[in-house]
UniProtKB/Swiss-Prot annotation:
Protein name: Ribosomal RNA small subunit methyltransferase G
Catalysed reaction, written as an equation: guanosine(527) in 16S rRNA + S-adenosyl-L-methionine = N(7)-methylguanosine(527) in 16S rRNA + S-adenosyl-L-homocysteine
Highest rank taxon of the organism: Bacteria
Keyword Metal-binding (UniProt): no
GO molecular function annotations of the record: rRNA (guanine-N7-)-methyltransferase activity
Gene Ontology cellular-component annotations: cytosol
Entry EC no(s): 2.1.1.170
Positions with a binding annotation for S-adenosyl-L-methionine: G73, I126, E127, R142
Organism in which the protein naturally occurs: Methylorubrum extorquens (strain PA1)
Annotated keywords: Cytoplasm, Methyltransferase, rRNA processing, S-adenosyl-L-methionine, Transferase
SUPFAM superfamilies for this protein: S-adenosyl-L-methionine-dependent methyltransferases
Keyword rRNA processing on entry: yes
Family membership noted in the UniProt record: Belongs to the methyltransferase superfamily. RNA methyltransferase RsmG family.
Function: Specifically methylates the N7 position of guanine in position 527 of 16S rRNA.
Source lineage: Bacteria, Pseudomonadati, Pseudomonadota, Alphaproteobacteria, Hyphomicrobiales
Length: 211
């Protein structure tokens, strides 16, 4: 891990000393659990501050006022657990983490306990719990599914005022075109701060295309 890269990420996102300590603990936990549970791509662990932490933190710059977040398919806690650590000093900040894999949920729960992250871990399939989480302001998911599937899962939220933030790679335009065959929505493509070819797809006002 590059100390210079860590310092750059913390400075760019104005991370407090206390939050930096929590993120360091998260990285230590991720490294320890990676040896027994493949939480992230092994090559990306060497670039964790850029590939994962900075990539997650940039979502806060897109929705700086939001305090009620939901992360689908949380896995290693990216971006949800990282967002919770960055926001835990803010009153009322909370992130729901939805993950169907029990061992990944064990990682999320233990790391949240050690870091004091303001999260609720939902060990369940998305479709089983999404309808009960309608107080969500922002729903996000990274590297989980094509956009059309994400919209299908989040329909109960995005039709009721919740904003979707979905980081996508170079296929973002293709996924948007495919999604527009089934859905009508307002969208913005926000350039990623960590990958010049990636975009954050911001979705609001979702409805199904009339048959």
């Amino acid at each position: 891990m590059s100390t210079d890269l860590r310092t750059h990420v913390l400075s760019e996102h104005h991370v407090s000393r206390e939050t930096a300590a929590s993120l360091d603990l998260y990285v230590a936990q991720l490294t320890r659990w990676q040896t027994v549970k493949n939480l992230v791509g092994p090559a990306t662990l060497k670039e964790v501050w850029h590939r994962h932490i900075a990539d997650a933190l940039q979502l806060l710059t897109v929705a700086p006022e939001a305090t009620r977040w939901l992360d689908l398919g949380s896995g290693a806690g990216i971006p949800g657990l990282i967002l919770a650590l960055a926001g835990k000093e803010r009153p009322g900040f909370h992130v729901g983490l939805v993950e169907s894999n029990a061992r990944k949920c064990a990682f999320l729960s233990e790391t949240a306990r050690l870091t004091g992250a303001p999260v609720t871990v939902h060990n369940a399939r998305i479709e089983a719990v999404i309808g009960t989480l309608t107080d969500t302001e922002i729903v996000c998911a990274r590297a989980l599914a094509p956009l059309s599937q994400l919209l299908a899962w989040t329909e109960p939220l995005l039709t009721s005022g919740t904003i979707g933030l979905f980081p996508k790679g170079r296929d973002a335009a293709t996924e948007l075109t495919e999604a527009e065959d089934e859905w009508t929505f307002t969208r913005d493509l926000i350039p990623s701060r960590t990958d010049s070819q990636a975009r954050i797809v911001r979705v609001t006002s979702l409805s199904r295309v009339d048959p």
